[in-house]
């Protein structure tokens, strides 16, 4: 699809049901009727960045900060594996407390003790760190590009440039990571043309995974009074992402459940072409009686989906949980042409 056709489809509210049906057909053909369950460990909400839309921003004095220890991270990852999930996602703010050596040790311990894939979502790190994490056994990296509008990116992420973000994403692929990207739908000042540019990027880059989420204003950020992203508009972005990437893993994030707790992720599966759900595996349980609750707080009152709730979403959508690690379908030589 060219940018003009993508923009027209994005703006065609009356024709969205046909778009949703096409996305579901593409998903069924290229991904099958199974879905990937991936357990997420939110291990730190410290962050050196000051993104205007994120509750983890360093200028937020009201957030309760936490850091999990290496043992806690590993134990949680092993519990995810024991629950039958084939992928562990280690996610944090951009937190330099966790050194290259610390993270490499955590990754090695996980892959030595469990047959799981390790996905990282740690923000931007030096290339030597990224290479070391790959060598330690991490095979995937999720780094959302957020928006392909460089001016909007700079406004939303003070002091940062889109060109640097894209360069890092390209480096991840060069290092051999299965590489995930994604955007935010509904950012203040974002246009339909901006969203079309995101979809063109998905089409050109053909990522191994896409993570799309809505803008939800956080009460402790400068954007607290802005409007929440629109569900139908976001689902049209989902559907177009599925159509242009065909067999990319497309995730229905927890923020989708925050926007619509009852049906958000279900709709992402049956209308948007999603085939991945990533339940939250915090709080970490030290024992059956000692529960440590860790709140990631990217958005106010973020809806966290448990493993059982994620399985219920799949049941409603008529999908079975896929066995194994759920590696990129692009690895089978099925790149979109």
Where are these regions (language model features)?
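Canonical Radical SAM [4Fe-4S] cluster-binding loop centered on the CxxxCxxC motif
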Residues: 31-72
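Catalytic cores of alpha/beta
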Residues: 126-133, 188-202, 258-272
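An N-cap/entry alpha-helix motif that binds or orients negatively charged groups
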Residues: 2-36
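Alpha-helix-loop-beta-strand connector modules within alpha/beta enzyme cores
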Residues: 98-122, 160-180, 225-249, 302-318
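Active-site-proximal loop/turn and secondary-structure-junction residues that shape catalytic pockets
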Residues: 41-43, 94-96, 122-126, 147-149, ...
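Auxiliary Fe-S-binding modules of radical SAM enzymes
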Residues: 1-14, 209-337
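Core AdoMet radical
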Residues: 58-76, 80-101, 107-169, 178-185, ...
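Conserved, mostly hydrophobic/aromatic
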Residues: 23, 51, 90, 143, ...
